[in-house]
Design a protein with these regions (language model features):
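N-terminal regions that are enriched for targeting/export leaders
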Residues: 2-21
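The substrate-binding groove and active-site-proximal loops of carbohydrate-active enzymes
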Residues: 21-31
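Acidic, His- and aromatic-enriched active-site or binding-groove loops in soluble protein domains
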Residues: 68-90
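Short, acidic/polar
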Residues: 32-40
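Single conserved hydrophobic/aromatic residue that forms the stacking wall/gate
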Residues: 119-127
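Aromatic-lined carbohydrate-binding surfaces of glycoside hydrolases
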Residues: 55-75
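Conserved, mostly hydrophobic/aromatic
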Residues: 43, 53
Length: 127
């Protein structure tokens, strides 16, 4: 017989382990853009409570987040270019159209995204 204590301090919950790079992405790699928000919505609808995203540090040898050169820095490839356009840090002209494979491609993303980042503009916040 399975007993369930409604007043138990800890209830059983579940989640998913999926690295950010494994999300679909328009620029060669998954990012914290629209697809990440859609994935969170999917997790909520399917009753999941947790999303473990693994290390977010710059990848090292073999594109592994576990062999990073820094445990404190973040991987810039996970920054979503479309979000930067939406928030006026980039203009749509700063992002050139390019075909990427359907799988995660660090090499292609690394040769593309940093070039787009060079167009970043200072953003003033008006209070």
């Amino acid at each position: 017989m399975l007993l369930k204590d409604k007043d138990a301090k800890y209830q059983r919950e579940s989640g998913v382990l999926l690295h950010i790079s494994s999300l679909p992405g328009a620029h060669g790699i998954g990012s914290f853009g629209k697809e990440a928000y859609e994935f969170v919505d999917f997790l909520k609808k399917s009753g999941q409570k947790y999303w473990q995203i693994l290390p977010l540090c710059p990848v090292g040898k073999g594109n592994s987040p576990y062999s990073s050169v820094s445990a404190f820095a973040g991987e810039i490839l996970f920054i979503d270019l479309n979000t930067l356009v939406r928030d006026s840090y980039l203009s749509p002209d700063d992002i050139t159209e390019r075909e990427f494979p359907e799988h995660t491609d660090y090499k292609a993303a690394r040769s593309y995204k940093p070039v787009s980042y060079t167009h970043l503009r200072a953003h003033e916040t008006v209070l």
